[in-house]
């Protein structure tokens, strides 16, 4: 049975990164893909469950494309698109970035859950 797509939340950081890396059309395709396949990205160690997906860019393919960092908890929360970067910019998140993501994840869960209960 097909499940409905997951809601996507684009963070300010992701939007800034995406604006310089990904066209509007490619961003829409990315969002549709992640919404339908929220577990597609590989888990990044030491981040509390943050994932990274390789996204092909026109003329560059997956290996020269963008890396999109996102968090998916479960179907009760949206997918949070956190950041994006070109493979030519860096290979992986730094330890400081991984630590920041690990601190961000519980805050996302708590803040979103509290906001949902208030409605």
Give the location of each predicted region.
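Residues that form generic nucleotide/phosphate-binding pockets
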Residues: 17, 33, 104-108
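Compact soluble domain cores
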Residues: 13, 22-42
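A generic structural signal for short beta-strands and their flanking turns/coil linkers
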Residues: 10, 30, 47-51
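Amphipathic alpha-helical transducer elements in NTP-driven molecular machines
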Residues: 24-27, 63, 98, 102
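Basic/aromatic recognition patch in beta-strand/loop cores that engages polyanionic ligands
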Residues: 40-85, 89
């Amino acid at each position: 049975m097909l499940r409905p797509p997951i809601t996507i939340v684009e963070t300010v950081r992701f939007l800034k990164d995406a604006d310089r890396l990904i066209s509007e059309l490619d961003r829409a395709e990315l969002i549709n893909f992640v919404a339908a396949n929220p577990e597609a990205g590989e888990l990044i160690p030491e981040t509390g469950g943050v994932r990274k997906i390789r996204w092909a860019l026109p003329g560059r393919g997956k290996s020269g494309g963008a890396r999109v960092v996102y968090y998916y908890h479960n179907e009760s929360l949206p997918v949070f698109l956190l950041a994006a970067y070109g493979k030519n910019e860096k290979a992986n998140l730094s330890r400081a970035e991984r630590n920041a993501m690990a601190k961000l994840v519980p805050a996302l869960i708590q803040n979103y859950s509290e906001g949902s209960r208030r409605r």
